[in-house]
């Protein structure tokens, strides 16, 4: 959980920027968006399968593109 120490005389804007930077580094907002709605395990597996297929096709495309330049 991100937390910052606000020093005496430090303005709100700089403290807010520090806090926002920590939140961004910890990927809290991304995690919240991902968990906003419940995703059944079957949907999760389906998405992983699609992502894997895209990754393989992308690598194959890059390989063919590289070989055509030789």
From Swiss-Prot:
GO terms for molecular function: structural constituent of ribosome. Pfam families: Ribosomal_S21. Keywords: Ribonucleoprotein, Ribosomal protein. GO terms for cellular component: ribonucleoprotein complex; ribosome. GO terms for biological process: translation. HAMAP family: Ribosomal_bS21 (MF_00358). Belongs to the bacterial ribosomal protein bS21 family. NCBIfam families: S21p. This is Small ribosomal subunit protein bS21. It comes from Nautilia profundicola (strain ATCC BAA-1463 / DSM 18972 / AmH). The lineage of its organism: Bacteria, Pseudomonadati, Campylobacterota, Epsilonproteobacteria, Nautiliales.
């Amino acid at each position: 959980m991100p937390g910052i120490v606000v020093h005496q005389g430090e303005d709100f804007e700089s403290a807010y920027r520090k806090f926002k930077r920590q939140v961004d580094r910890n990927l809290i907002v991304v995690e919240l968006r991902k968990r906003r709605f419940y995703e059944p395990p079957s949907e999760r597996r389906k998405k992983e399968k699609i992502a894997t297929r895209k990754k393989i096709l992308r690598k194959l495309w890059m390989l063919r593109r590289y070989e055509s330049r030789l």
